[in-house]
């Protein structure tokens, strides 16, 4: 719908992995340094609040298992690597703590993101929020035995290698703000060498844990036919992507596409006016009605039980979010899709969400209405449209 002010974040990484599988933390400690090297992330300091570390260690396996079951993966064993931070170009942390989730081959499968609660907007009573998604996990695994830097701007995330060439590795559909400079300089090595400490993100911090018990005990409920068929590019069609994937799921078809949805609703728009147009809730409801559905607007976040019942009855839910950081720009408002819900083995209730920007799903605390997304922003879930 609406777009966001671009931000720049710098993250420097050094990659070197052995092909030897990791059995557990103890066996890893016996591997000599010359035989085993790890992905290292440059950070200003390695300090992590005790509450943050405890939350990650206590809950990561439950959240990861919920996504494994959504993806129909087999039971597996995981552990956490050392946490790292992401910095803006002024070398200030973005405020989040990132914990890589390692499989027994030493690769990163997921990223646990722990964020301070945004008091003004969040309905959660906890001090921190935890979310799990694939995020940059695949990217981190692609640069073994290389020293790289990861940067982000309005177009997405870049890897800068030792030859100073930048490659776009993860797109985020964001536009340059007209008030900003047309060109953005990539920081030289001096900008990141001031980050003196290194977090070995692929070094296990504890023994690997099997999710066998967790897997068996968890309750998972998903729109049976929900698939990610396309992702949002440089446009304002988040509502189009959301509705097309929900309708594809509930009708068990592949016929809906975001561009066709937007063209149906805005047949007379051309060029950039069409490319960057968004949809109102009324237009979203109208489109659902034209497709044989009876969508209803709910002026709040759906509860866990509502998601559970609607999903069981094959009724899709669209999330309507308002960006916390800024109410201006192309993505000041954003639509996402509810994939399903899960009750973790510890009793925690979560909602599984798909952001049209992403190639994977993410977990969301069912009692927290502020959703962190893959470009570092947060969206307050203020309304829902259900019944697709």
Swiss-Prot record:
GO cellular component term, pick one: extracellular region
Entry keyword annotation includes Transcription regulation: no
Catalyzed reactions: Broad endopeptidase action on proteins including elastin, but rather limited hydrolysis of small-molecule substrates. Assays are conveniently made with hemoglobin, casein or Z-Phe-Arg-NHMec as substrate
A GO molecular function held by the record: cysteine-type peptidase activity
Signal peptide segment: 1-25
EC number(s) given by UniProt: 3.4.22.48
Positions in coiled-coil regions: none
Keywords from the named record: Hydrolase, Protease, Secreted, Signal, Thiol protease, Virulence, Zymogen
Main location: secreted
Subcellular location(s) of the protein: Secreted
Keyword Hydrolase: yes
Record's comment on post-translational modification: Cleavage leads to the activation of ScpA probably by an auto-catalytic manner.
Induction record: Expression occurs in a growth phase-dependent manner with optimal expression at post-exponential phase. Up-regulated by Agr (accessory gene regulator) and repressed by SarA (staphylococcal accessory regulator) and sigmaB factor.
InterPro entries with a match to the protein in the record: Cystatin_sf, Papain-like_cys_pep_sf, Pept_his_AS, Peptidase_C47, Staphopain_pro, Staphopain_pro_sf
Pfam families: Peptidase_C47, Staphopain_pro
Cleavage, annotated site positions: 214-215
Quaternary structure and partners: In the cytoplasm, prematurely activated/folded ScpA forms a stable non-covalent complex with ScpB.
Family from the record: Belongs to the peptidase C47 family.
Additional comment: The catalytic maturation of ScpA appears to reside outside the cascade of activation started by the metalloprotease aureolysin (aur).
Function: Cysteine protease that plays an important role in the inhibition of host innate immune response. Cleaves host elastins found in connective tissues, pulmonary surfactant protein A in the lungs, and the chemokine receptor CXCR2 on leukocytes. Proteolytic cleavage of surfactant protein A impairs bacterial phagocytosis by neutrophils while CXCR2 degradation blocks neutrophil activation and chemotaxis. Additionally, promotes vascular leakage by activating the plasma kallikerin/kinin system, resulting in hypotension.
Protein name: Staphopain A
Source species of the chain: Staphylococcus aureus (strain NCTC 8325 / PS 47)
């Amino acid at each position: 719908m609406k777009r966001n002010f671009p931000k720049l974040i710098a993250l420097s990484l050094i990659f070197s992995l052995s092909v030897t599988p990791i059995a557990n933390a103890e066996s890893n400690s016996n591997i000599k340094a010359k035989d085993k090297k790890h992905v290292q992330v440059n950070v200003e300091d390695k300090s992590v609040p005790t509450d943050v570390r405890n939350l990650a260690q206590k809950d990561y396996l439950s959240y990861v298992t919920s996504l494994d079951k959504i993806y129909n993966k087999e039971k597996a064993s995981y552990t956490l690597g050392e946490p790292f931070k992401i910095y803006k170009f002024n070398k200030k942390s973005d405020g989040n703590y990132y914990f890589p989730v390692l499989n027994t081959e030493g690769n990163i499968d997921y990223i646990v993101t722990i964020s301070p609660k945004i008091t003004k907007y969040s309905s959660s009573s906890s001090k921190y929020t935890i979310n799990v998604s694939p995020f940059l996990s695949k990217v981190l695994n692609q640069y073994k035995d290389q020293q790289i830097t990861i940067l982000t701007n309005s177009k997405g995330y870049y890897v800068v290698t030792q030859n100073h060439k930048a490659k776009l590795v993860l797109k985020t559909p964001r536009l340059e703000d007209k008030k900003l400079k047309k060109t953005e300089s990539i920081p030289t090595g001096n900008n990141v060498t001031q980050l003196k400490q290194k977090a070995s993100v692929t070094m296990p911090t504890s023994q690997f844990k099997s999710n066998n018990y967790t897997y068996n005990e968890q309750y998972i409920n998903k729109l049976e036919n929900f698939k990610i068929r396309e992702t949002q590019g440089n446009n304002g069609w988040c509502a189009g992507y959301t509705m097309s994937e929900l309708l594809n799921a509930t009708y068990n078809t592949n016929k809906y596409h975001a561009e066709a949805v937007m063209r149906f609703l805005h047949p007379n728009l051309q060029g950039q006016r069409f490319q960057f147009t968004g949809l109102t809730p009324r237009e979203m409801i109208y489109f659902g009605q034209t497709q044989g559905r009876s969508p209803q607007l709910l002026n709040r976040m759906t509860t866990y039980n509502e998601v559970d019942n609607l999903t069981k009855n094959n009724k899709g839910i669209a999330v309507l979010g308002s960006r916390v950081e800024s109410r201006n720009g192309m993505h000041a408002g954003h639509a996402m899709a509810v994939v399903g819900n899960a009750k973790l083995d510890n009793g925690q209730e979560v909602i599984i969400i798909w952001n049209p920007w992403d190639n994977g799903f993410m977990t969301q605390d069912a009692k927290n209405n502020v959703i962190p997304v893959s470009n570092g922003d947060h969206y307050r879930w203020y309304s829902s449209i259900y019944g697709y």
